[in-house]
């Protein structure tokens, strides 16, 4: 179902994320992308997504979709979590591997949380997807920071090594967007 008169506004500055969201959502909605600077609070991925969604809805004055991702390493008690981008920018993927080298447990969970708000004053709804894996030395090339070190459980390859179509059909982002799509299509059906 598309509705070009009422596009779904996705707030992100990440062009690769836009391509992935469009590929996964398909004709579910007409996407309009806005790159606006939003404050990011300190907190869990859910708290950050919820606050980002509220701020975006207030800023644009209408319905909005936002996303935040996290990488939770079990041996580190869930760190770096929602702060993975800052970790990768500061110490790189090799730095994350070095930190984890002191632990036997290399398991990790990729987490993607989308927030949707109907507009100012509406409580954001959250849609979360999780993908199990483990941290390995970097393999493959990716435009998403930590994908070369995240080996998907049962696949034997990192997200960066995976063919795009396959990745878009099993990723943490895919799982979150499937939940959003089901809700969105159900919410738009006439009563």
UniProtKB/Swiss-Prot annotation:
Its EC number is 3.6.1.66. Keywords: Cytoplasm, Hydrolase, Magnesium, Manganese, Metal-binding, Nucleotide metabolism, Nucleotide-binding, Nucleus. It is an enzyme of class 3 (hydrolase). Coiled coil: none annotated. Pfam families: Ham1p_like. Mg(2+) binds at residue 40. Its cofactor is Mg(2+); Mn(2+). One of its GO terms (cellular component) is nucleus. It is found in: Cytoplasm; Nucleus. GO terms for biological process: deoxyribonucleoside triphosphate catabolic process; nucleotide metabolic process. Homodimer. This is Inosine triphosphate pyrophosphatase.
